Amino acid sequence: MRHVVPAARLALGALFAATGVGGFLGLLPLAAPHAFQVMLIESGWMKVVKAIELGAGLLLLSNRFVPLGLALLAPGVVSITLYHLLLDPAFLWIVPVIVALEGFLLWTYRGSFRGLLVRDAQPGA
């Protein structure tokens, strides 16, 4: 386990940092983009998504605030999964990789999320 966690963290961080940078620089291939993807790009929302991917990827790569990076990536991982399952199965092969890395790291860092699961949380506590 000594090398597995850093390897998973670096792999997921590199993947999302690269797609974040690629999205900003227009380096990602778009083969016949789906209408949903076009809407995200035209509305400017894709820039927000890519900024979050880049920021969270850099957090994972730097080994700083890793639980925050994982929390920021979680909604994106769900979106990527649903997008490829329902709309664009061409890149479906990447989904198990992303889900496995994110799930493994969330489980590994689960202690950092315990405070979020307090049933009757009090303000300021």
Where do the protein language model's features map onto the residues?
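Membrane-interface extramembranous regions
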Residues: 1-125
